[in-house]
A protein has these predicted regions:
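Transmembrane helix-loop-helix hairpins at lipid-water interfaces of multipass membrane proteins
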Residues: 9, 15-72, 76, 149-154, ...
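Alpha-helical transmembrane segments of multi-pass membrane proteins
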Residues: 14-15, 21, 62-81, 132-139, ...
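Hydrophobic alpha-helical transmembrane segments of ABC transporter permease domains
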Residues: 20, 24, 28-32, 57, ...
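Short intracellular "coupling" helices and adjacent cytoplasmic loop segments at the cytosolic face
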Residues: 46, 82, 90-114, 118-120, ...
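ABC-type nucleotide-binding domain
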Residues: 326-579
Length: 579
């Protein structure tokens, strides 16, 4: 938890002023019982109304001064805690963006969202309460005992006996409840994760008619959470009765022994009332400390989870921003004896991959499900690093490139078409912020998206809803292809990006890419033979290994894996035809 306090370094002034004003407020609060004692001993005893009014005015003044100090403290504590949360959220977001696919896969995107939202909010609230109470509550307890000591040394013994008893009672209850609250937080995280997964996979759940099963699992989880909360709540509910019983015994003792000392003339009636008020102040301060400790416990649990994310080191690190010189005569992309495996996998996903893709070539990649097609093309923009071997772009190892240079050379169309809320123009300018409308329309034309965009009322200024919900699957895919084409990348990667397109549109798309992107090296990952049949070179993957490389006719006649795929989709006559 202490690691996170560095985010308060820009709010040192607020972190000092907030607690300081809380101490000043506490001083005003400690003065109130003495003023009340004077009203009783002087004003009421002597029936001196002017004095009562005067002291009443002092009480009002103390109340207003205390309120002003409390509001000031709250302002500075809120400013510091909000700044803390903003800085922490910014750095965590930056750190998450620095992680490679491997780390994100390992931690889980749902977990990262929870850390960014719920855990940071908990830590932020903890800082706010900490700045307001960590000095005030102990100061009130100590101050009340000192003020009681100044009134009566003998009666202060009651305070010295009761205060530890109160503290121990609160400690005992919290010692039991804090582990309960930690379990509640874990179960709450599980509930949040389950909710997120259910909402994300709602269509799949309905497709398999799993609603009842999911509802039962969710109900069981929330019931377990409810039981845990009830247990913690019942134990926590003992705090107020237990502490008030102890305080009431203390008040009885003060009144009993104080009454005797009043008769003997050692102290006055007002001073006895002041002692009772100080005892109540101690009680409230200790209860506030209990709230503080509870929030610190929650904050600590959240801080541990946040630090766990910060402790994840990116396996793929960026070089400095100095561009590297490339070799214009080298192959555009070259794999040299590459081996790759996922962090949680026991076996390699790719084994001994070697091939060259020259500038301007179209490379088709095909293979069965799980053969490693997406894993292979994810190594080119360095989303993952190879375990062994080299991946070169323009003769330079991808590890030597700054991310900005390497990924600036590559246009990527992922399997899932992802669009962002905003205009079509905004989405098209993701690769090149300075892309003109002409550049965008050219890319839309190649991607077979120009016609439907022109029919939109606002054309390029048409708003796209979150995740492109107001577009069909085919429209989303064509827009993501167009986005990758904006800026004329040196390398274009199409990862099964025509799955939502009909065959006619797919043919027109491949023809347009071939005719209008001369010099661009294109990688087409597809399950369709028709999509890669006319490629200059086809790579056939089988269980992470290259089963064959060549043209369609070469592979059909010399690679059994490729021939089997062909005949599963085409007639023998169609399969034997070239292009």
């Amino acid at each position: 938890m202490l690691k996170l306090f560095r985010y308060l370094k820009n709010y040192k002034k607020e972190s000092i002023i907030g607690p300081l004003f809380k101490l000043i407020e506490a001083c005003f609060e400690l003065a109130v019982p003495l003023v009340m004692a004077n009203i009783i001993d002087v004003g009421i005893k002597n029936q001196d109304k002017p004095y009562i009014y005067k002291m009443g005015g002092v009480l009002v003044l103390l109340a207003f001064c205390g309120l002003a100090c409390a509001l000031t403290a709250q302002y500075f504590a809120a400013k510091a805690s909000l700044g803390f949360g903003t800085a922490l959220r910014r750095d965590l977001f930056k750190h998450i963006n620095s992680l490679s696919y491997a780390e994100i896969d390992s931690v889980g995107s749902h977990t990262l969202v929870t850390r960014m939202t719920a855990d940071i909010n908990t830590a932020q609230q903890g800082v706010n309460i900490l700045l307001r109470l960590f000095l005030r509550s102990p100061f009130i307890v100590l101050g009340s005992i000192i003020m009681a000591f100044s009134i009566s040394v003998k009666l202060t013994l009651i305070f010295l006996i009761i205060a530890p008893c109160l503290a121990y009672a609160i400690y005992l209850i919290m010692h039991i409840t804090i582990p309960q609250y930690k379990n509640i937080q874990k179960k709450l995280d599980k509930t949040n994760l389950m909710t997120s997964e259910t909402l994300t996979g709602a269509r799949v759940i309905r497709a398999f008619s799993r609603q009842k099963d999911e509802e039962k699992e969710f109900a069981d989880n929330t019931e377990e959470l409810r039981r845990q909360q009830i247990i913690a709540g019942r134990i926590s509910a003992l705090m107020n009765p237990a502490t008030y019983v102890i305080v009431n015994f203390a008040i009885i003792a003060i009144i009993w022994f104080g009454g005797k000392t009043v008769y003997s003339g050692s102290i006055s009636q007002g001073e006895v009332i002041a002692l009772v008020n100080y005892m109540n102040q101690i009680l409230l301060a200790l209860l506030a400390m209990a709230i503080l400790v509870t929030n610190i416990t929650k904050m600590q649990a959240s801080a541990i989870r946040i630090n766990d994310v910060f402790d994840v080191e990116p396996s793929v690190s960026d070089k400095d921003n100095k561009p590297v010189a490339t070799d214009g005569n080298a192959p555009c992309v070259e794999f040299r004896n590459c081996f790759f495996s996922y962090a949680s996998a026991e076996a390699d996903s790719l084994s001994d991959i070697s091939f060259k893709a020259m500038k301007g070539e179209t490379i088709g990649i095909i293979g069965g499900t799980g053969s490693g097609k997406t894993s292979l093309i994810n190594l080119i923009p360095r989303f993952y690093d190879v375990r062994q071997g080299e991946v070169l772009v323009d003769g330079v190892d991808v590890k030597e490139y700054p991310f900005s240079q390497l990924r600036g050379m590559i246009g990527i169309v992922p399997q899932k078409a992802v669009l962002f809320k905003g205009t079509i123009r905004h989405n098209m300018q993701w690769r090149d912020k300075n892309a003109t409308d002409e550049d965008i329309w050219n890319a839309l034309d190649i991607a077979q998206a120009k016609d439907f965009v022109e029919k939109k009322p606002d054309k390029l200024d048409e708003m796209i809803l979150q995740e492109g919900k107001n577009l069909s699957g085919g429209q989303r895919q064509r827009l993501t292809i167009a986005r990758a084409l904006v800026g004329d990348p040196e390398i274009l990667i199409l990862d099964d990006s025509a799955s939502a397109l009909d065959l006619a549109t797919d043919v027109r798309l491949r023809k347009a890419i071939h005719e209008k992107t001369s010099g661009m090296t294109v990688f087409i990952v597809s399950q369709r033979i028709s999509s890669i049949k006319s490629a200059d070179k086809i790579i056939v993957l089988d269980d992470g290994k290259i089963a064959g490389i060549g043209t369609h006719s070469e592979l059909y006649n010399g690679c059994e894996v490729y021939k089997e795929i062909c005949l599963s989709q085409l007639s023998e006559k169609e399969a034997q035809a070239n292009g």
